[in-house]
From Swiss-Prot:
It is found in: Cell membrane; Cell junction, Gap junction. This is Innexin inx6. Residues 1-21, 166-220, 324-481 are cytoplasmic. Keywords: Cell junction, Cell membrane, Gap junction, Ion channel, Ion transport, Membrane, Transmembrane, Transmembrane helix, Transport.
Length: 481
């Protein structure tokens, strides 16, 4: 048995790169291992023997067992009387005179005719007792042969979301986070991977990251849908499993094992009835009332008690995870706080500035990277992104970022340039006279355009005939004369 279950431990082993959150792991991976382990237990014939044993003559033993295994067994379901109590409750509180009259009947068939409810109460087991053919209701145990197949189908059902996400994920996290998940990293590898991650997140993959995150949210929603589908499936297969078994589980905390045996026997009876027709030599049919023991139900009642609690637990977690996902999508401030938990005290303003230009998809990929890389490297990655954002702002056109000095008024221009020596080139000298109506950004920009020249003369030459440099004061005095 251990050799059969051992390969499942490799499935639960933590991978180098994790692509599932803890709730997803519980819902898919852990549930699959539990269900497959239960399947192996039920199929272990050496521990529980034959799946069915029927009481019959030695000559017909194999035939009867094969017939009842193939055609199925049944029990007599508990009926609710007019006061709302079950058959065994009715018998416990039956009037003394009625019970006395019943005990005076010598035949069991007469007892059935007199009081079938009480006759079934004193029968062999819950659901096994005398019946009136064609009148008494029967509940066939058609699931018994297929329990291990049901568990196997459930394991495949719960595996589907994780398989779908693995296909959609396409090893993106493995490519981003390989070689940097350890506590100690080679310096060259550290720097190389840091530069690659920085370039990746600076490359603006927002639409791809958005699709990536939405696909993961869809797989989480699929987990919830599968949990609900599983509830319905078990309730149909096991004839009201969720309602009946809650009473059995309620008996465990108070150690009421009689109630436990009674309630579990209504879903997983250990003893059941089987009916077979045997024809005589002349063709007259005879009905054989056969009693069968169902050994696997001893294990089924324990397995499904555990699965009852586990399925409720993971369904609740899956619903809470969907609510959390909706909250994270709608609340940027919550995304900021969650990301800061992986940054070891990085200033909040820096993180906010990095996330200001990032959407939910970018944040989701960053969170996935944070749980797969070295914490120091992840913090340095965010610092690099912050530095690149500031550098990008500084390398934008100067008029958009750098402040300029206040432009002097036109009246102050003569005094400002009174002692300045001007260039010999007339075309460059023209640009030194400043248009007072120009904005300060246009004045600071050298590469984009020149400042508009002040309209004076068509050809402005500040050079004397002997190449003497004329001062600005002299130029203004002569021009106004």
């Amino acid at each position: 048995m251990y050799a059969a279950v051992k390969p499942l431990s490799n499935y639960l082993r933590l991978k180098t790169v994790r692509i599932y959150d803890p709730i997803f792991t519980l819902h898919s991976k852990c549930t699959i291992v539990i269900l497959l382990t239960c399947t192996f237990l039920l199929s272990a014939k050496q521990y529980f023997g034959e799946p069915i044993l029927c009481l019959s003559s030695e000559r017909q033993a194999d035939y009867v067992q094969s017939y009842c295994w193939t055609m199925g067994t049944y029990i007599l379901p508990a009926e609710v009387d007019r006061d709302g109590g079950s058959s065994w409750e009715y018998a416990l509180y039956a009037p003394t005179s009625t019970a006395a009259e019943t005990f005076n009947v010598s035949s069991l068939r007469a007892l059935v005719a007199q009081n079938e409810q009480y006759a079934r109460f004193i029968s062999i087991a819950e659901g096994v007792g005398p019946e009136t053919r064609g009148v008494t209701k029967r509940m066939y145990l058609r699931y018994y042969q297929w329990v291990f197949m049901i568990l196997l189908f459930q394991s495949l059902l719960f595996y589907f979301p994780s398989f779908l996400w693995k296909v959609w994920e396409g090893q993106r996290m493995e490519q981003l986070c390989c070689e940097v998940g350890d506590a100690l990293i080679v310096e060259a590898t550290y720097r190389t991977r840091l530069q690659m991650l920085t370039r990746y997140f600076r490359a603006q993959f927002a639409p791809i990251h958005w699709c990536y995150s939405i696909k993961y949210a869809f797989c989480e929603l699929l987990n919830v849908f599968i949990s609900i589908l599983n509830f319905w499936l078990m309730d149909v297969v096991f004839n009201g499993f969720w309602y009946k078994y809650i009473h059995a589980l309620a008996a465990i905390p108070v150690y009421d094992w009689n109630l436990w045996n009674l309630m579990t026997s209504r879903v997983f009876p250990k003893v059941a009835k089987c009916e077979m027709f045997v024809y005589g030599p002349s063709g007259t049919p005879n009905i054989m009332d056969i009693l069968c023991v169902l050994p696997l139900n001893i294990l089924n009642e324990k397995i499904f008690a555990v699965l009852y609690v586990w399925f409720l637990f993971i369904a609740l977690l899956a619903i809470m995870n969907i609510l959390y996902r909706l909250l994270v999508i709608c609340c940027p401030e919550l995304r900021l706080q969650l990301l800061r938990t992986h940054l070891n005290g990085m200033p909040k303003s820096h993180v906010r500035e990095v996330l200001a230009s990032a959407g939910y998809g970018d944040w989701f990929v960053l969170m996935c990277v944070s749980i797969n890389v070295n914490p120091t490297l992840f913090r340095e990655l965010l610092e690099q992104l912050y530095a690149k954002l500031n550098q990008a702002r500084c390398t934008e056109p100067v008029f958009a970022e750098q402040p300029c000095q206040q432009v002097p008024q036109l009246a102050q221009v003569p005094q400002l340039f009174s002692h300045a020596k001007l260039d010999r080139c007339p075309s460059r000298n023209c640009s030194l006279l400043i248009d007072p109506t120009a904005d300060r950004h246009s004045i600071c920009t050298e590469s984009s355009h020149r400042v508009t020249a002040m309209p004076t003369a068509p050809t402005l030459n500040l050079m004397a005939p002997n190449d003497e440099i004329i001062s600005m004061d002299r130029f203004f005095h002569e021009s106004h004369a």
